[in-house]
Amino acid sequence: MVRTLFDTNILVDYLNGIPQAKTELTLHTDKAISIVTWMEIQVGVAPADQVVLDLFLLGFTVLPIDTPVSVKAVELSKSTRIKLPDAIIWATALVNQRLLIARNSKDFSPSAQGVLVPYII
């Protein structure tokens, strides 16, 4: 069983009804998100959709930003020039030994360490 961490764009795609995101999410049982993804999703939700979002997010373990994640995020941001929120998400996956599943191939190359880009839209 692969332990996964989903990037924000996969969750947004799922909530917007993108079939590839629904398929990808059903393939995995040990699913997590970074607290950064949790915050990004919360900021974008309409009040009328809050309950649905909260129920959806119960299917994920929310991983915090701790010192090892912070150190790794700074290292990734400096070496790859990706934005800090993306570096934090990637670092969270690496430090917690999870496969990062992301659609943003601009920031997360399909050949990057510990990253899977399952589809592009």
Residue ranges and their predicted role:
Residues 10-11, 37, 69, 88-89, ...:
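Alpha-helix capping/helix-boundary segments
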Residues 58-79:
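Acidic catalytic patch
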Residues 78, 82, 98:
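Short glycine/serine/threonine/alanine-rich loop segments
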Residues 18, 90, 94-121:
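Acidic, PIN/NYN-like endoribonuclease modules and their adjacent C-terminal/linker elements
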Residues 1-33, 42-54, 58:
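Short, well-structured N-terminal submotif of metal-dependent ribonuclease cores
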Residues 28-30, 59-61, 95-99:
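Short active-site oxyanion
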